[in-house]
Amino acid sequence: MVKEIASWLLILSMVVFVSPVLAINGGGYPRCNCEDEGNSFWSTENILETQRVSDFLIAVAYFSIPIELLYFVSCSNVPFKWVLFEFIAFIVLCGMTHLLHGWTYSAHPFRLMMAFTVFKMLTALVSCATAITLITLIPLLLKVKVREFMLKKKAHELGREVGLILIKKETGFHVRMLTQEIRKSLDRHTILYTTLVELSKTLGLQNCAVWMPNDGGTEMDLTHELRGRGGYGGCSVSMEDLDVVRIRESDEVNVLSVDSSIARASGGGGDVSEIGAVAAIRMPMLRVSDFNGELSYAILVCVLPGGTPRDWTYQEIEIVKVVADQVTVALDHAAVLEESQLMREKLAEQNRALQMAKRDALRASQARNAFQKTMSEGMRRPMHSILGLLSMIQDEKLSDEQKMIVDTMVKTGNVMSNLVGDSMDVPDGRFGTEMKPFSLHRTIHEAACMARCLCLCNGIRFLVDAEKSLPDNVVGDERRVFQVILHIVGSLVKPRKRQEGSSLMFKVLKERGSLDRSDHRWAAWRSPASSADGDVYIRFEMNVENDDSSSQSFASVSSRDQEVGDVRFSGGYGLGQDLSFGVCKKVVQLIHGNISVVPGSDGSPETMSLLLRFRRRPSISVHGSSESPAPDHHAHPHSNSLLRGLQVLLVDTNDSNRAVTRKLLEKLGCDVTAVSSGFDCLTAIAPGSSSPSTSFQVVVLDLQMAEMDGYEVAMRIRSRSWPLIVATTVSLDEEMWDKCAQIGINGVVRKPVVLRAMESELRRVLLQADQLL
């Protein structure tokens, strides 16, 4: 609406101003009423000539401007092109008007005047149209100006934001550089000094210091500083200081006054004029904080150079905050690493100790294995050979005295064999027992004979007193009973060797009266399968008596048995005897007994009492029973008819044992072929060998062989269902028996191999094989 009103007002003003001019001039052009001054420069002719030249020059200028505008419009995307085209037309018409006007100063034809008039009218119309168009464009141009102002403002804001971004980028660069330098080391002192140096370089600081709380938490101590202190001697600030309290309570950077005590101390202790602006921030010490939520803080103080109007900027404060956080984390990591390093060193030390203990254990195991091998080769195998030979001698026709001596030798050999076996089984805590029927009277008689020999050899008199009412047929471990009795005799005789007037009293009696069944030491004896009527308790008491002192009564010994059962000896008895007594006591407990000791005045044992429980065994009936002992060989002269002519292959790596076992088998009537290894055994029974493999009916196999043990040989034999296998082994428990049964071994004889044990096992194996067939 405003644009239309402005256009009509412009047209109306032109009509108002042009009409009077036309009326005044009567419709024609005014004529100049000038006087020509003749020869003057400003003569009429000169003026007209000058105007004509000016018109031509104006026309040339007007014609050149449209060319430039046309080139500009064609080369760029300019808004309002139609306005520019109006300007071009207006300028061209103006140029034509001036050009034609230049020809009218002299005599000219009517057509020129007519053309001049037409172009002038066109110029007037175009100029009016252009003016009207400009009126409509002015508001748009004003909007463009406003937009220009807005763009300038936005450009200014953008420049400011770019500046902030550049500042942040620079700050980030400094922070990354400082963080990288801080994290290069894992030592806390190096971390702090690196922080001080790099932060001072980055921010151009005069000094930089770290304050930490003392052990009591009452003061802040200056612990790390970039530059040494000057004349100011204070290096501690109280925790109650206002600046310290303000810093510790705020997590922001605090700008301190130069008069502050912590600021002066951090600035090197010099003049206040030499210190610039001071900033401080707390650093949490995570590793020394308690679990109640109370944190411990260190303080980082940064001092700007003095004598300059420089102050802390936002960028510098942000750098200090980030560096403080990074230092806190780095110190915490360093503390964790120190603890880890200490733990690693402790673990390494423990590992070295474990390795040393492992080597010691390995050496001990090797020494034990060497000891066991030596004991086995040097003592156990020869003892087994001797016992085997003695078993053959027992089968000969001997007088009663000779038979008693041989039987005593066999019992003593069994004790020796048990001792050797126990010495090898002590580290494992295993002591084997073998419960079987035996004659108690014969065992007591043989033990008394052996004790008498020991006493006479040591110059001590020996007395024996055994009740006639003692049962004879009992069930127990005969070898262990004999071993314990000999140990007691040796323990009493050895400390009094060649002592004048000493005598050893050996008494055996049946325990009468009721025992205290609630005693924990007797609780292990009782079992649901046994009743009180089927058990018998026998007490073996040995007492050393001197002629010049009254002997200890056996009744008192029996009454004090419960009190002194766990006595350990000292003095002359010694640590070795004490250990031996401990082993003996363990053996006694295994055979359902208890042992007690009464020490003498010198600390050596004076009285020892052994109480054992045996199972009663019914007397042998005329028809025999399942528990009856094997029939005597002389009473049954044809008992070996089953074994006579039996083809046996004997496999044993020990020459002496192999020879003794061969003699035993030959005495039983077997035809024996002996080999010294498992390979020779497999070769001997293999098809196509020089030996007739089908003639071997039984293979007697030693399980403890060096190159190829008996288990592997037995498995190879059983893979083709070859002859019956009877194994010989040192120790036989339920686990070993199950293993032998799984492999296919038909029978097992425990070493030492004696005649009757071998005969009984071979007979059982052959009868079982016949029943299966």
UniProtKB/Swiss-Prot annotation:
> Domain Response regulatory spans what residues?
647-766
Report which residue ranges the record marks as coiled coil: none
SUPFAM superfamilies the record matches? CheY-like, GAF domain-like, Homodimeric domain of signal transducing histidine kinase
Q: How does it assemble?
A: Heteromer with ETR1. Binds to MRF3/ECIP1.
Question: What is the designated name of this protein?
Answer: Ethylene receptor 2
Tissue expression pattern: Expressed in seedlings, roots, leaves, flowers, mature siliques, shoot apical meristems, leaf primordia, inflorescence meristems, young floral meristems, developing petals, carpels and ovules. Low expression in stamens.
EC no. given is 2.7.11.-
